[in-house]
Amino acid sequence: GMPGRMTTVHLSLSDATGDSAILEWIDGELTIHHDRAYQVMTNEPRFEDQLAITRYWGRVDGTVFLPGTSRAEDRFARASFLINAIPKTDDTREAAAAVFSVIRNASAPWGVSVDDQPNLSTTRWRVVADHKDRLYYFESVYSPNVFWVDLKNIDFAEATGVRMLDLGPNQRNIFSGEVSEAFVVAQPFTFEPAE
């Protein structure tokens, strides 16, 4: 797929208690899937179909065989197995590293496209939210570094206005470490009108 093209979108929300919801818009209608167990998603197929994939692959030993293509269904199956296979830890940096390893394993490789699958698109960035330490990690395919925002350093009061971290054209600005001081005043994001 190409940046700027219409595509299926799922939005994942989670909180510090481990609660989770997946929001998806199908034919302009919002559907919310709410369950603590919903820890993985891809933009396609519909989330109910992703749950069916989980049921199918849940019967297969993922240490012996997992699907390996760039198709969303295969990436979802890998991520679903791996998120439950990584070690659970109270060390937040180790936990973030483990989650990044799952996301990288399930990312669509750079430049891969399939003619009859226009929504198969390169993974351009990955994010991990650390609810415990209130850190938001970001990794761009263009950057050699993972960087993060310490949300405790951000003033979310309405009076401070909108701020953004300018990643530059195609996310080519390079950041390293904690970047809350690099945020600049900006205009609010404007959504394109629905067709």
Predicted regions and their residues:
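C-terminus-biased signal that marks the final domain/tail of proteins
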Residues: 4-7, 16-18, 39-195
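Structured, non-membrane catalytic/scaffold regions adjacent to prosthetic-group chemistry
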Residues: 1-37
